[in-house]
UniProtKB/Swiss-Prot annotation:
Plays a crucial role in the metabolism of thyroid hormones (TH) and has specific roles in TH activation and inactivation by deiodination. Catalyzes the deiodination of L-thyroxine (T4) to 3,5,3'-triiodothyronine (T3), 3,3',5'-triiodothyronine (rT3) to 3,3'-diiodothyronine (3,3'-T2) and 3',5'-diiodothyronine (3',5'-T2) to 3'-monoiodothyronine (3'-T1) via outer-ring deiodination (ORD). Catalyzes the deiodination of T4 to 3,3',5'-triiodothyronine (rT3) via inner-ring deiodination (IRD). GO terms for biological process: amino acid metabolic process; hormone biosynthetic process; thyroid hormone catabolic process; thyroid hormone generation; thyroid hormone metabolic process. The gene is DIO1. It is a single-pass type III membrane protein. It is linked to Thyroid hormone metabolism, abnormal, 2: An autosomal dominant disorder characterized by slightly increased thyroid-stimulating hormone levels, and elevated serum reverse triiodothyronine (rT3) levels and rT3/T3 ratios. This is Type I iodothyronine deiodinase. It comes from Homo sapiens (Human).
C-alpha cells in the first residue's frame, strides 16, 4: 500500500484535533459535572447493551472514558473510517483471512452461488459484540436455509494492554498471527455455529470494511447488499434479520 495522499493527511490531522478536543472537554466536564456526564455515558451504553450486560458494573467501564487509552483507540477507529470505501451495491473487498487451522483463504470463498453471506466482524473483548452474539446465533438458526454466515475475528476492541475494561476477558493486543488465532479460539466456547476466521496481521479486512470495533455486512454475488453502521453504538443484528426476512418473503 502506498503512502496516504495529502488530502487524507489533512483529514487525519482534523480528526486528531477533533478527538483531542473531545477528550479534553470530556475530562473537564467529568470533573465539573460527574453525575451528568455519567448519565450521558449510561444513555449511550443502553444502545450497546452495556447497561444490561451482567458481566459489567458501571464502575468497570465508565471511568475509562477520556483516558489516554480511550484517546488512542477512538483516534484509530476514526482514522480507519476515513478510508472506508465500501458502499451499497459496490464490490465487496475480497480480503485475505485465515482459518483457525492456519489455512489462508479469502472472504469470497465462503460465498455459495447467489446465497447471501453475512459477515460479522468483532472480537472477544468487545462487550457489545459478545453481548449480542446470541442474537447473531439466532439469525443462523432462523436463516441458514437461505444464507451463509462468517465471523471475522479482528483486533481486540478492549485489549488488557489497551483501552481495557475491568472484569472483561484478559486478552492482550495481538503481536502475531498466533496470538490472534488463540484469541479467536476462545470464541468457540460460544458455539458460533458458523465458520470463524481471523483477519491478517495487516488488518486488511478490518480496514477495507471499516469494521473496528465491530460491524455487520451482507454480501451477495460479490456485492454489498447491506452495510451495518459502525459499532458499538449502532451494531444491530436485528437489522440483518429484517434484510434476510425481506429476501425470504
Amino acid at each position: 500500500m502506498g503512502l496516504p495522499q495529502p488530502g487524507l493527511w489533512l483529514k487525519r490531522l482534523w480528526v486528531l484535533l477533533e478527538v483531542a478536543v473531545h477528550v479534553v472537554v470530556g475530562k473537564v466536564l467529568l470533573i465539573l459535572f460527574p453525575d451528568r456526564v455519567k448519565r450521558n455515558i449510561l444513555a449511550m451504553g443502553e444502545k450497546t447493551g452495556m447497561t444490561r450486560n451482567p458481566h459489567f458494573s458501571h464502575d468497570n467501564w465508565i471511568p475509562t472514558f477520556f483516558s489516554t487509552q480511550y484517546f488512542w483507540f477512538v483516534l484509530k477507529v476514526r482514522w480507519q473510517r476515513l478510508e472506508d470505501t465500501t458502499e451499497l451495491g459496490g464490490l465487496a473487498p475480497n480480503c485475505p483471512v485465515v482459518r483457525l487451522s492456519g489455512q489462508r483463504c479469502n472472504i469470497w470463498e465462503f460465498m455459495q452461488g447467489n446465497r447471501p453471506l453475512v459477515l460479522n466482524f468483532g472480537s472477544c473483548t468487545u462487550p457489545s459484540f459478545m453481548f449480542k452474539f446470541d442474537q447473531f446465533k439466532r439469525l443462523i438458526e432462523d436463516f441458514s436455509s437461505i444464507a451463509d454466515f462468517l465471523v471475522i475475528y479482528i483486533e481486540e476492541a478492549h485489549a488488557s494492554d489497551g483501552w481495557a475494561f475491568k472484569n472483561n476477558m484478559d486478552i492482550r493486543n495481538h503481536q502475531n498471527l498466533q496470538d490472534r488465532l488463540q484469541a479467536a479460539h476462545l470464541l468457540l466456547a460460544r458455539s458460533p455455529q458458523c465458520p470463524v476466521v481471523v483477519d491478517t496481521m495487516q488488518n486488511q479486512s478490518s480496514q477495507l470494511y471499516a469494521a473496528l470495533p465491530e460491524r455487520l455486512y451482507i454480501i451477495q454475488e460479490g456485492r454489498i447488499l447491506y452495510k451495518g453502521k459502525s459499532g458499538p453504538w449502532n451494531y444491530n443484528p436485528e437489522e440483518v434479520r429484517a434484510v434476510l426476512e425481506k429476501l425470504h418473503s
